[in-house]
Amino acid sequence: MNWITNYVRPRINSMLGRREVPENLWIKCPETGEMVFHKDLESNKWVIPASGYHMKMPAKARLADLFDNGEYESLPQPKVAQDPLKFRDSKKYIDRLRDSRVKTEQEDTILAGLGKVRGLKLVAVVHEFNFIGGSLGIAAGEAIVKAFERATLEKCPLVMFPASGGARMQEGILSLMQLPRTTVAVDLLKESGQPYVVVLTNPTTGGVTASYAMLGDIHLAEPGAEIGFAGKRVIEQTLREKLPEGFQTSEYLLEHGMVDMVVKRHDIPETLARLLKILTKKPVSAANDMNGGAIALAASA
């Protein structure tokens, strides 16, 4: 026991009235360097108030924000094999899983819920980027497949919010197997006649982009999101060319026809509701806002 650390320092701190400062009390905007109080950021849906920069939004917060009154049924996390390859790099994979579970309070990167958005029933699937980079492994793949099956059973649309670096390297070929599995799940939902909409968030890359993230009937994207397969630096080194400014951003992909709409986070629930009501042929209130025409155009494309 270190008596200075465990006894003397706490006594001095209490005498002087000093308090331990929690981590992440202030959060720095990567774009402008602005410091934002964490509660202000959370209340603004993790969007920097001054610049409008969209920070990564926790999966639980996104589901609560999406569904009416924050009410939804959490879909169960399927049980799968843990660390089947007994993988180890600089750290044991099983330890990485344990640390990520403590950090995020989730079993794995995928959270799925069934609820209503502006009165319309749907299943939403969200990646938690803070869980090993939102990577796609066996557990995530199984959770996604089960979510598509539930949407098919409920005869309702599914909305996907990817945020991922791609396939989980610690699971090797078992991770890559999730690409065709999730692709088949998308096809089964579409065969049932239900819409599949993807809301691309920052970042959406790698094997996730190569599979279910780019198979939607309609693709929305948050402002400034990085979307692509390989990273910009890898592409530049391979081609030995400088890439255009803003390459792989949601705005660039919108301009080049890869994304249907770029939608601010605050507008996503309303935009999704309008789109899905058009796609499912349900009554839609008159679109008086500027996005009304774009929504109708995207849905009819």
From Swiss-Prot:
Component of the acetyl coenzyme A carboxylase (ACC) complex. Biotin carboxylase (BC) catalyzes the carboxylation of biotin on its carrier protein (BCCP) and then the CO(2) group is transferred by the transcarboxylase to acetyl-CoA to form malonyl-CoA. One of its GO terms (cellular component) is acetate CoA-transferase complex. This is Acetyl-coenzyme A carboxylase carboxyl transferase subunit beta. Its EC number is 2.1.3.15. PROSITE patterns: COA_CT_NTER (PS50980). The gene is accD. It is found in: Cytoplasm. Pathway: Lipid metabolism; malonyl-CoA biosynthesis; malonyl-CoA from acetyl-CoA: step 1/1. GO terms for molecular function: acetyl-CoA carboxylase activity; ATP binding; carboxyl- or carbamoyltransferase activity. The keyword Hydrolase does not apply. It catalyses: N(6)-carboxybiotinyl-L-lysyl-[protein] + acetyl-CoA = N(6)-biotinyl-L-lysyl-[protein] + malonyl-CoA. It comes from Rhizobium etli (strain CIAT 652).
